[in-house]
Amino acid sequence: MPIIVLVAFILYAITLSVALGRRGLPSASAATDGTAPAQRPRLLIVGATGGTGRQLVAQALDRGHEVTALVRNPSRLEIEHPRLRVLQGDVSDYASVEAAVRGQDVVVSALGHKRFFGPTRILSEGTRNLLRAMEAQGVARFICETSLGIGSSAGRMGLYYTLFVIPVILPFYFWDKTRQERLIAASSVEWVIVRPGVLTNQGKRGSYRHDPRVGSLIWTVHISRADVADFMLNQLESNTYLRTAPGVCW
């Protein structure tokens, strides 16, 4: 019986990985002109109190951007800067989302949550509101963090994540990320979906692999939140991955 259970579980994990791949975005050819407007765009950052979000805010300010952070609890964002505006709101509330999007040039999303053990649409419904507000306000570009393990990157977080973490701990979370990606791809905005490996709190190396096919089928791949933020902000000034979903890892 234990062998039967083990075989059944492995088949479930593989089936889930295949399903995430089929339901997610396919691999696509990246744009090649590599150019974007030279002017420093004004940024709205959502998910700004999370690990990647804090890095996005700090690094964007260091690069000279004007930054608006939409957060549920402003006291959790312990950054003060003359070019930082903090708005209290929730991505589930369209009115607060539209107010935050108004006047921006780019929206950068590092949305996340810790409600792993039940069905949820926090990511997808929040993203739906962001895209709706962007289209209403004429904001062109959207940079969004999701994860390796979805779409064409299914299975590329390594065996441990493919066979255990995703199917046992994070299946609902990854299904919602898959819905999130499909909403973005169906929108009219200029988008880049960034799929990182397993996130760490190490410092920024500034050197990492990025491509729609990065990752490993065997070994767990990692990258720091600081490097993910660096790569996401680089997409403000480049069209290389426009309307594609590159992975990023060390």
Model regions and ranges:
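Non-catalytic terminal and boundary segments that flank Rossmann-like NAD(P)-dependent oxidoreductase
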Residues: 1-41
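Glycine/proline-rich active-site loop of Rossmann-fold NAD(P)-dependent oxidoreductases
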Residues: 152-154, 203-209, 235-244
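Conserved beta-loop-beta element that borders a ligand/cofactor-binding pocket
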Residues: 181-202
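Substrate-positioning beta->alpha
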Residues: 123-126, 176, 194, 223-233, ...
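NAD(P)H-binding glycine-rich loop region in Rossmannoid oxidoreductase-like domains
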Residues: 43-44, 75-129, 133-136, 236-240
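N-terminal Rossmann NAD(P)H-binding glycine-rich loop of SDR-like oxidoreductase domains
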Residues: 43-63
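Conserved catalytic-site region of short-chain dehydrogenase/reductase
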Residues: 116, 148-154, 199-202
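Conserved Rossmann-fold NAD(P)-dependent oxidoreductase catalytic core, especially the SDR/UDP-sugar
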Residues: 44, 66-68, 74, 128-172, ...
